[in-house]
Each structure stands twice: as C-alpha cells, then as structure tokens.
A protein has these predicted regions:
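Central cavity-lining transmembrane alpha-helices of secondary-active solute carriers
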Residues: 68-83, 299-312
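C-terminal transmembrane helical hairpin of 12-TM major facilitator-type secondary transporters
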Residues: 326-373
Length: 445
C-alpha cells in the first residue's frame, strides 16, 4: 500500500550534518524519461499515421477515431490508476503501467494480422490496441506526480514537477526524428516494435531503483531526507504510525477547486492533442511541407515545451512566494493560456509557413507549460492522495484529448483547418477562466 512514509529511525533524523545526497533528482530524472517515452509512444501513430492511412485506405474521420481511441482508454483508467497507486504503492503500479503500454505499443505493429482482432477489421484492430495502450499510459503520469509529493519538499516541488513534465517535451522532440528515421529505413511497423522493447527495459529499471518513499531508499542519507521533509506537509515524525490515506471523495467532488482543475485541464489538453495527432499530417497536406522537413517541424511544439515547462515551474514558485499560492498559480496559468490562444489564432491565419509554424509551436509549448501548474496545484490542495486527485483531473483532460482529434477532423473537413485551429484557441481561453474556481492555498481536506 502507498501509505504515509514509514517511521524514520531517530539517528537518521538527527544526523543531518552531512552533504545531502541527490537521489531525489535521480528519481525525477527516471520519471522524466518515462514521461518522455509515453509521449513518443503517443506521437508515433501521428507520424506513422500517413503511412497507415494510405496502406489501409482510412479516411480522415476513421483516422480521427483511431487517434481518439488512445485518449478514451487514457481517460477511463486515470482515476483507477491513481487510486491503485494510493492503495497498493506507486512503484508496483507504475511498473505494471509501463509494461502494459509498452507491450501494446509493440502489438500495434501487428494488430490487423492478429486472429481475434483481424476479424474485426483493420480500423477496429488499431482502435482496440490503442485503447488498451491508453489504459496502461493512464496511470503513468498521475503516479509519477504522486511520487513528486513524497520525494520533493514544497520548495522544490513545482520545479521538480516541471522537470518531470519537461520529459514530455523531450519525448516530443525525439519522436519525429526517431520515428521518422525508423520509418524511412525499416518501415512504420519497426518503430512500434522498438519502442515496446525500450519501454520494457525502462520498467525494469524503475522497479529496481525507485521506491515509494525516500525513507525506503538505501541511497538517501539523513541530510537529503531532512531537506525533503523540512518543507513537506506529508513528512513523518519519528514515532509516526502507518495509516492508509483514504480519499474523501465527497469533499473532492464538492470542491470548486477540483472542478476548476478538471475543466481547465480538459481545455488545455484539447489543443495539445492536435499537435500529438494531426500536426504532422496538417503540415504535409495543408501547408505543403516536404515529409523530411515536416518530421522536424513536428518536434517544434515539444522543443518549446522543453524550455517553457521548467520556466513556468520556476515562475509559478516565484509568483506563489510573492502573491500567495492562489493568485500566483492563477497568474502563471493566465499568462500561458492568453499567449497560447493569441498565437494559435495568429498562426492559423499566417500564410508564411515558417512564421505560422513557429507561432503554432510556441502556442503548443505554452499549453504544456500552463498545464504543469495544474499538476503542482494537485499536490498543493491534496498532497496525501495526489495520485487519486491527479488521476481525476487527468480523466477530464483525457476526454479533451479524446474529443480533440475527432472534432478537429470534423471541423477541418467541413470548414477548413483555419477554423479548427481558431476553435482550439477559444477552448484554450476557457481553461484560464476555470481558474477563478481554484483556491490553490486551501487544502481539500
């Protein structure tokens, strides 16, 4: 069970005259790599989608539903995944989640040829496999975020969480290059098989090295533990008993802050999934960009993410110190969504490809950056059961990710891509208004 940290020996608490070890940052690094791999696995079909669509003769609407299947599975299992982490331990649940999404990433390569799935048709085969893959990935980010609550003190938490989520940006940068190169040399199926193998190795590393709590890790010395616990609301006392953190669901669902987080995340993830699913195809078919250049340009929103997410984590911490958590977190999100919405609108109306793609990429990076503040706020308002809270918030966000490729295809087919991106800009602004419901300085319990 992922309980409060176990009792700490008195000697380990008192002997803090050592140079602190940095195991917590090794854990954050592994979790950031995991976050990056999840996004490579999500983006691979968006990049390989052109080839899949041509081979199996899928129209845009069918492809939109296949893209959406992943997000639907992702939405369905976020809350159970977070609850399982709270109940049975982050390490076990995270390892199982990584193995699940890695295995089904590999299965994507052969889905239509499997006896059971093949009988349903190619479209259903891909959709089912992507749905199950989404189930596996659903637990990964909320469980990783829960680990942040235990492994980092409050003063480091926003920055550490931003590094963790910047792994998403690194994965987004790597995906078009790695997947594009693999497809050109070995075909689209190879990218799924290789990524499945990489995920299996990463799952084994995390199971071996990462623990639920820093107290359990043999490499953490007393000074590092004191640094973590000195600013943590969930740190132990020497004689603390071990109790299960039961989630007060009635308080959670009656909390305006929780509803604000869910609505805001839904609206932030909607435009993000345009970049995850349709951006490569948009560049090739609408903007007329050559495939090799499109592979590189597809990385642009995630390059922006790589720099903007840590910056927004730092800004969020500084704003919270100066303005208080409620006003500081809200101001940081509003800065991101206002700029993102403006750039989405401007980019969709710009004819020059270089300027247009640069604006759209910056908009995508700002959406990622603003969303990182939401994860920190989950720990602000409910650190003891942040796995469940993060899972609930991300369930709503994933519904935005499910709707995004389907509705975007429908709007683009009927009215054109300019309107599809303008609508995404409007949705982004709504995410900012949801923050008037959120009180980051008040715990739910």
């Amino acid at each position: 069970m992922d309980q409060n940290p176990p009792p700490v020996e008195a000697a380990k608490i008192q002997n803090t005259n050592l140079v602190p070890t940095r195991v917590r940052w090794h854990v954050v690094t592994l979790l950031a790599i995991m976050a990056g791999l999840t996004y490579i696995d999500r983006l691979n079909l968006g990049i390989a989608g052109k080839y899949v669509q041509e081979e199996f003769k899928f129209d845009s609407q069918t492809m939109g539903w296949i893209f959406g299947a992943f997000s639907l599975g992702y939405a369905v299992f976020h809350l159970p995944g977070g609850w399982l982490a709270d109940r049975f331990g982050s390490r076990r649940v995270l390892t199982g989640a990584i193995l699940c999404f890695s295995i089904f990433t590999a299965v994507t390569a052969i889905a239509p040829s499997l006896p059971v799935l093949g009988s349903l048709g190619a479209a259903w085969s891909f959709a089912i496999v992507r749905f199950v893959m989404g189930l596996g990935e659903a637990a990964a980010i909320p469980v990783g975020n829960k680990m942040m609550a235990y492994w980092l003190g409050e003063k480091e938490r926003a920055f550490g969480t931003s590094i963790f989520l910047a792994g998403v940006g690194a994965g987004g940068v790597a995906a078009p290059v790695l997947v594009g190169w693999t497809i050109r040399h070995w075909g689209w199926r190879a990218c799924f098989l290789l990524l499945g193998a990489a995920g299996t190795v990463l799952g084994a590393l995390i199971y071996k090295y990462v623990t639920n709590h820093p107290e359990e890790h043999p490499g953490v010395n007393a000074a590092e533990l004191a640094s973590i616990r000195s600013s943590s609301k969930i740190g132990p006392t020497p004689n603390q008993s071990v109790v299960v953190n039961k989630v007060p669901w009635i308080k959670v669902f009656s909390s305006p802050s929780m509803w604000g987080l869910m609505i805001s995340h839904f609206c932030l993830i909607y435009p993000v999934y345009i970049f995850v699913t349709w951006f490569f195809i948009y560049l090739v078919r609408v903007r007329g960009v050559a495939i090799p250049k499109a592979s590189l340009w597809t990385s642009a929103p995630f390059i922006a993410n790589l720099f903007m997410v840590p910056l927004w984590g730092w800004l969020s911490d500084r704003a919270a110190e100066r303005l208080g958590k409620r006003r500081g977190r809200r101001a940081t999100v509003w800065l991101g969504v206002a700029c993102s919405a403006g750039l989405l609108w401007s980019g969709s109306h710009t004819e020059n490809n270089t300027f247009a793609i640069a604006q759209l990429a910056a908009a995508g990076g700002l959406n990622f950056a603003a969303s990182s503040v939401l994860w920190t706020t989950c720990n602000d308002i409910a650190a003891k059961y942040s796995g469940s809270i993060s899972g609930l918030m991300t369930t709503f966000g994933s519904l935005g990710g499910w709707l995004s490729p389907i509705l975007t295809a429908a709007i683009a087919t009927r009215f054109g891509w300019t309107y599809a991106l303008d609508f995404a800009a409007l949705v982004t602004l709504v995410s900012g208004f949801a923050w008037f419901l959120i009180k980051a300085d008040q715990a739910i319990d």
